[in-house]
A protein has these predicted regions:
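Solvent-exposed alpha-helices and their adjacent loops that cap or buttress functional pockets
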Residues: 15, 27, 75, 97-98, ...
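Electropositive phosphate-/nucleotide-binding environments in soluble metabolic enzymes
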Residues: 1-3, 7, 56-63, 67, ...
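Glycine-rich anion-binding loop/nest that anchors nucleotide
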Residues: 17-21, 82, 109, 242-249, ...
Length: 280
């Protein structure tokens, strides 16, 4: 059974001296087969996987486990990566590593396109281009593309400004990847919600003035019939209110806060292209 599983794995993976692969199976006294396997399709970066199956002494079941692990290893992986707020010095080391190793990079509108210069010469670059009221690819198309490229065995980077889980639709994409059985990893990025104010000299918390800060979308999805923001509660908050992507709706945001009791003299700032040389 062990031998059947190992041979099936190596056959399915196409293991050779050009693309190192290894599989080790162990059948315990209860008829449970445990197998560990690894594969280096690019001859440098090993992928590892393991699996367990109650096979008894049925060699065909061992074959099934070996082939299943091979399929998992030949499938690619997706990294949902935050590129930071725009200043290249604020890009994380892990973000750079992901970009440099990626087979495919699906990227949004970035504050600095020079980050893409870090990609391999043979990497496939696909623009998804999200800006207010204009998406080069619709979200479902982006989701499908991530899954498609990963199933081709590619290492895929989904590159977003800021942090992928702060109004970056990273959560939606992670859900779709999980449902499709695609391995993925979240790579946090510096968010403009605190990076941009910091570069403007504004602390979002301060012992004398703000014991909390609140990050709020300034651009609610078009699928909503109206705002779901509770301006009555927001207006009462002592902490700093940070509205992201709010330039277009700035008059509405300000008027809603004031209408719900926020002092019109409350200190406020509008920051564009924060942390970059174009900040204003």
């Amino acid at each position: 059974v062990e031998l059947c599983a190992e041979r099936a794995f190596l056959k399915a993976i196409g293991g050779s001296c050009n693309a190192p692969a290894a599989g080790l199976a162990h059948l315990d006294e209860n008829g449970v087969l445990q197998m560990d396997a690894l594969f280096a399709p690019d001859q440098k970066h090993y992928r590892r996987v393991s699996g367990t199956l109650e096979t008894g002494f049925d060699g065909d079941k061992g074959v099934c486990l070996g082939e299943e692990l091979a399929e998992k290893l030949m499938q690619g992986k997706v990294w949902l990566v935050g590129a930071g707020p725009g200043n290249m010095d604020l890009v994380t080391q892990k973000c750079l590593r992901c970009i440099r190793q990626a087979d495919v990079i699906i990227y949004d509108s970035l504050a600095t396109d020079s980050l893409l210069n870090e990609a391999r010469m043979d990497a496939e670059l696909i623009y998804a281009g999200k800006r207010a009221d204009h998406h080069h690819l619709r979200q479902w198309e982006t989701n499908a593309l991530l899954i498609e490229k990963a199933k081709e065995g590619k290492n895929v980077v989904r590159l977003k400004g800021g942090d992928p889980f702060i109004f970056g639709r990273g959560g939606e994409e992670a859900q779709e990847l999980r449902a499709a059985g695609i391995e993925y990893e979240i790579v946090c990025g510096v968010s403009s919600c605190y990076g941009a104010p910091a570069y403007a000299g504004i602390p979002v918390t301060h012992r004398d003035h703000a014991s909390s800060f609140h990050v709020i979308t300034g651009h609610e999805g078009n699928h909503k019939s109206g705002t779901v923001l509770d301006y009555a509660t927001l207006a009462k908050e002592e902490g700093t209110l940070v509205f992201l992507m709010g330039l277009k709706n700035l008059p509405s945001i300000a008027s809603n806060l004031i209408a719900n009791g926020k002092d019109p003299k409350t200190p406020a700032a509008v920051i564009q292209e924060g942390t970059t040389a174009r900040q204003r």
